[in-house]
């Protein structure tokens, strides 16, 4: 069995990235229970790669400490029934399911993402919580990072 232990914030930051104090404070304020925090920089964003409520999560902030997005990896059983039904009736139903995520935003509704593969093709299929198809992104041979929408 794997066990995960919480580490003090002092030891978790990637020393090669200079994370602004406003960003580290914003993380502590928004998600005080985040553990095993490792900071990454993606474009102009600072991303806290951490454990949150038992889920591997990426929490996106701008340099001023404004929260833009939380992406958490989940299991199929965590995907709402309406999304499962919509996916099972989609053109991707027979593709290999690779990963599942839910995305939280400050202003936009929550989204669920199902990442699928077939042969050398890879797609991300985005759904609303009620199972509405929102977007399909071809990430074949590309960086499959999901960036926050411009709000």
Language model segments and positions:
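Bacterial signal peptide processing site
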Residues: 8-11
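First exposed extracellular module after export/assembly in secreted or surface-exposed proteins
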Residues: 15-151
